[in-house]
């Protein structure tokens, strides 16, 4: 049996070793685990902070870091009575906007974590989408297809239009902040002029829900994800009908986030996050996945180093996308191959806790083949391959 003195010496040695232990630096921040499914996430525009809203109506603010053990919850809010559908930071990062199934709009002070403004019954039905246009103007869309555009200086909406027959899934606007676009569960793209405060047109009805919308290719193309796994492409000022479309070989394309002018990340109900090049249309590879869990939303951080994702596994995961802007896509369509595995675009593409090697190829292996499997087979349903 060791003497008391020996025990004390060992204890002091362990404390000393812990004090001088070098913190582990990770490629990406650790996963954040919540107690409910997270519907929505947003990165702070100036700091390493992430906001999240869950199906219970709770909103959380986290600081994140690549130093192991340094992710911290800064505050939480339970002001929403039902599921939180969307969170967004103001451009200066001082305010956090949120919308909910409870039909309310909340604006919170980010530093204090306090509710500053509440607009109850902002819509007659649950709110599903939101876009911040500038420091005073924002837009919201609801479950029945109504679009509202708000002026915070007056605290009221100055546009209240219903032209969609189903929920508004996403909203975006052009750089001039003149033409506002909506995607809808009725399968149409909506076009609105917020300068003249009027509705312009709806596109032709596509096959299945339009789940997301983004403007790409220096403002010349509008890209929509869809519930049946097809990406639809419209020409700017040619919103009536698609100019191109291609199947992504995914169950759905539920959320899209542009990374460059040509490359976007797309999340699906199959749990996989794909990098996709637009014109030429190619699935470049996989960023990562939530194994077997539907992804609700993805978001890009301010310096395009990380992508975050939230899914039905109640996890927020971070992915390294810093090399994605350097990906090159060949215009030339090679002969289709039977091997339809995705190229892994991050080290964590394999980090799933299960055997994901069966579905992915390592980047080093891929480079050794000189890009022979350039995902050319994934554009087999595309109507065109170049701009």
UniProtKB/Swiss-Prot annotation:
Q: Where is the signal peptide?
A: none
Question: Any idea which UniProt keywords this protein has?
Answer: Nucleus, Repeat, rRNA processing, WD repeat
Task: List the Pfam families.
Answer: WDR55
Q: Where are the WD repeats?
A: 33-72, 79-118, 122-160, 163-202, 205-244, 247-286, 290-329
Q: Does the keyword Nucleus apply?
A: yes
Q: Outline the segment boundaries, as ranges, of region: Disordered.
A: 1-24, 356-387
Q: Where is the composition biased (Acidic residues)?
A: 372-387
User: Cellular component terms, GO, for this chain's entry?
Assistant: nucleolus
Question: How does gene deletion manifest?
Answer: Death between 10 and 12 dpf. Thymus size is remarkably reduced and the pharyngeal arches are malformed. Eyes and swim bladder are also reduced.
Function of the protein: Nucleolar protein that acts as a modulator of rRNA synthesis. Plays a central role during organogenesis.
UniProt lists the family membership as follows: Belongs to the WD repeat WDR55 family.
- What name is this protein filed under? WD repeat-containing protein 55
Q: Which organism is it from?
A: Danio rerio
Query: Where is the organism placed in the taxonomic lineage, from the top?
Result: Eukaryota, Metazoa, Chordata, Craniata, Vertebrata
């Amino acid at each position: 049996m060791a003497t008391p003195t020996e025990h004390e010496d060992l204890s002091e040695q362990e404390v000393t070793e812990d004090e001088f232990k070098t913190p582990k630096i990770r490629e990406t921040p650790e996963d954040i685990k919540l107690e409910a499914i997270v519907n929505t996430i947003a990165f702070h525009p100036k700091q390493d902070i992430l906001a999240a809203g869950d199906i219970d109506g709770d909103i959380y603010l986290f600081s994140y870091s690549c130093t192991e053990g340094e992710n911290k919850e800064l505050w939480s809010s339970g002001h929403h009575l039902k599921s939180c559908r969307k969170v967004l930071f103001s451009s200066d990062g001082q305010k956090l906007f949120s919308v909910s199934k409870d039909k309310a709009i909340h604006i919170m002070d980010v530093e204090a974590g306090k509710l500053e403004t509440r607009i109850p019954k902002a819509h007659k039905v649950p709110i599903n989408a939101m876009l911040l246009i500038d420091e005073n103007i924002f837009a919201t869309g609801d479950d029945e297809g109504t679009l509202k555009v708000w002026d915070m200086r007056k605290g009221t909406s100055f546009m209240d239009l219903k032209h969609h027959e189903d929920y508004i899934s996403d909203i975006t606007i052009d750089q001039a902040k003149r033409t506002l676009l909506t995607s809808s569960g009725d399968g149409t793209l909506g076009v609105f002029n917020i300068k003249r405060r009027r509705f312009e047109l709806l596109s032709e009805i596509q096959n299945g829900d339009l789940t997301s919308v983004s403007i790409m290719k220096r403002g010349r193309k509008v890209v929509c994800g869809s519930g049946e796994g097809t990406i639809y492409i419209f020409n700017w000022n040619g919103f009536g009908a698609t100019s191109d479309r291609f199947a992504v070989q995914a169950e759905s394309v539920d959320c899209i986030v542009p990374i460059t002018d040509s490359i976007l990340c797309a999340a699906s109900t199959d749990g996989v996050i794909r990098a996709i090049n637009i014109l030429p249309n190619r699935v470049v590879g996989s960023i990562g996945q939530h194994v077997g869990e539907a992804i609700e939303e993805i978001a890009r951080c301010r310096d395009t180093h990380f992508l975050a994702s939230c899914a039905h596994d109640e996890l927020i995961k971070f992915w390294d996308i810093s090399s994605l802007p350097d990906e090159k896509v060949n215009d030339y369509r090679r002969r289709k191959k039977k091997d339809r595995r995705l190229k892994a675009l991050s080290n964590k593409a394999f980090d799933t806790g299960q055997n994901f090697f069966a579905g992915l190829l390592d980047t080093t292996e891929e480079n050794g083949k000189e890009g022979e499997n350039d995902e050319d087979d994934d554009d087999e349903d595309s109507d065109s391959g170049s701009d």
